[in-house]
Amino acid sequence: MKKTFFLLFCLLIAVSACRQSMRTVPADNPRQGTTEEEASVESFYDEQKASEARNEQPATNIRMMELPAPLKDRPEQILRKKGFTISYNKKTKVPNWVAWHLTKSHTYGRMQRHNEVFTPDDEVPSPRAIDDDYYTSRYDRGHMCPAGDNKWDAQAMRESFLFSNICPQNHGLNKNEWNDLEIKCREWAREFGAVDIVCGPVFGLHDNEMQQKTIGKNKVWVPDAFFKVVLCRKGYPKAIGFIYKNQGKFQRMSECVYTVDEIERITGIDFYPLLNDNIEDRVEADARLSDW
């Protein structure tokens, strides 16, 4: 199905001579050697591969199948939280992506969000997002990994309110369509036993970075849209993707469906690299809401 939003991205790709592909955040400079940031990312992925080779559970106590491939075209700092993993971007002050393995049991719990407050993440460098950046912005503090997926544990719930897991999000989208999608993902986790989820911001509607909208004194980037990809590994594996514009105008879920391949082209992120190649190729090329 052709969608206006996807065509817009494709058009930008075609007319931008300076871009080879649609990227969420271009690199600041060509990388020379291995930076401390790169070494940290490589160490994280090496640790997970070593754990898998020893048939051990990874140190994060979550399955690592949901993790995208390392990013080379933008800043990336991997943050391992109890209930999810963050790829943080020090330039945009928001995550590149947030990934988690949502099980049926994790959709239940006693932890309540009204007991929590939004907090700067001390693991990321300054300047970083703080509450003051949002006060007069008219944007909600939008969760990437939702509080509703972290009711199972006090630490997981608390960490979901770190600003490294938050993006400036239109109020209408946050309270309506995005919330509906979060609820739908929990329903799928209960139905299938578990799902692997990755979501994050989409940038790229501005060829000139000076046109990028920001909020607050720390210049937190405002996304043009948000993506979410969901993988079910049970039985005959399947995957589905979504992109919602960061706006208040109503967006029907069925009209926001994308294949994972399409979202990879738009975001420049390689999803589910640990899947068997044959399975990955198949599930990423097809997306039908009716299959879910």
Please annotate each region the language model reported.
Residues L8-A14:
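Bacterial N-terminal signal peptides
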Residues F5-F6, A17-W292:
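Domain-level detector for secreted/extracellular nuclease and nuclease-toxin modules, and
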